[in-house]
Amino acid sequence: MGRLDGRPFQRVNDCGLRASSPTFDKEPCMPKPSGACFLRRYGDLMTCHLLALCFDANDPLRLARFWAGVLGWEMVDDPEGGVALLPSNDIGFRFEFFPSQEQKAGPNRMHFHLTSTSLEDQQQTVARALGLGARHIDIGQRPEEGHVVLADPEGTEFCVIEPGNNWLADCGFFAELACNGSQKVGHFWSEALGWPLVWDQDQETAIRSPRGGPKISWGGPPLMPKTGKNRLHFDIAPPVHGDQKAEVDRLVSVGATRIDIGQGEVSWVVMADPDGNEFCVLTPR
């Protein structure tokens, strides 16, 4: 799979990659820098962190319960009025679910890759997801591909990857957030979060926190048309002693724009990345 239009990504987001693929016998990426190296290279960018991946949901509680069951994460009340999931391991960000009356229109620009340790483990993950309300979907994947493509109760696409995928090795169960996006937007998020690029070839990019956790990847052209506000977006925030305005100014300088989606007077700043994807810059925390 990889792309949700059925055309596989060349490398980064190809859900059908096999361990025997010559491209992926070894992870084809820049080596993850050490802490000292990371500070030398990205130290001036360490002014915000990825706080949450936010879902617009018609039924936030139901969707949160689904993902809590699939991922094994703890469900808690969110201080902003939604529902949040706290990860069972230190991936660095949470999931948050907020009410929305908007219906899903077309594929999301982001989807999830969940890994498997064995074929039995893959089957168990699929069965668990189906039992919680997922459904099989056909996005043009080929019969010989080993991954399983599903959608959550509100249509959010995700793939359960077969065992032996070298690209996702050591990334954990929730291994990748695979996005439709340009090379420019991959470079933007590398600078925005201070996460190094672990792939940057053929207009495909991927980043990963120096602490580990899932990769975030962008598959390059052609880009999906944007149909209204994205149902998934990032919340980022400066650290406790940071400066929200300074962070917003920095993000504008590397390609973001401030946008108005009718948010009114709120404490956060709504912005869009170079591909037009909305995200929010919260107050320091």
At which residue positions do the language-model features occur?
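Vicinal oxygen chelate
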Residues: 42, 48, 55, 93-97, ...
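Short hydrophobic/aromatic beta-strand micro-patches
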Residues: 56, 113-117, 178-180, 235-239
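Hydrophobic, helix-prone linear segments
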Residues: 22, 38-92, 96-108
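Short, conserved charged micro-motifs
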Residues: 61-65, 119-125, 184-186, 241-247
